[in-house]
């Protein structure tokens, strides 16, 4: 028998909404930061690269926090923590790994962006801002894989 759809309890709806909203904000912030940083790659004025850094701080970081809080909320409400690690589905592991490692990479990108913005005031920092934008693009690819895993739920 093939499962066409699965239902979950309505008590989890708000937690899932918070998780998905945070993920959408995070991905939107990463798209904006990556595109602005890559378009402004050769910009001598650093304007787009600074906008990219600001987007990481103001959009992507809060989105990551909301996404992670929502994920933990769903995890506890669905009682996934009661299962042995062997029985937890692959998509859940993909989500945790991408969120945790992605959070570390996001923090590295934020530190580089912050130092780059500070140095940009005195005429430098372009390489740090470019690296921050490149990390945002890498994170975007990683989180697209996570969105696929969460949506498609392979095994």
Language-model features and meaning:
Residues 2-155:
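Polytopic transmembrane helical bundles with strong interfacial aromatic enrichment
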């Amino acid at each position: 028998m093939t499962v066409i759809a699965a239902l979950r309890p309505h008590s989890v709806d708000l937690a899932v909404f918070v998780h998905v909203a945070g993920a959408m904000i995070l991905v939107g912030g990463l798209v904006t930061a990556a595109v602005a940083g890559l378009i402004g790659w050769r910009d001598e004025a650093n304007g787009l690269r600074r906008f990219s850094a600001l987007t990481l701080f103001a959009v992507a970081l809060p989105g990551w926090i909301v996404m992670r809080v929502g994920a933990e909320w769903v995890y506890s409400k669905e009682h996934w923590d009661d299962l042995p690690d062997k029985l937890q589905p692959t998509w859940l592991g993909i989500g945790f790994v991408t969120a945790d490692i992605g959070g570390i990479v996001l923090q590295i990108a934020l530190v580089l962006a912050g130092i780059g913005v500070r140095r940009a005031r005195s005429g430098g920092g372009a390489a740090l801002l470019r690296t921050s934008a490149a990390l945002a693009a890498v994170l975007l690819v990683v989180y697209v894989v996570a969105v696929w895993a969460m949506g498609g739920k392979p095994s």
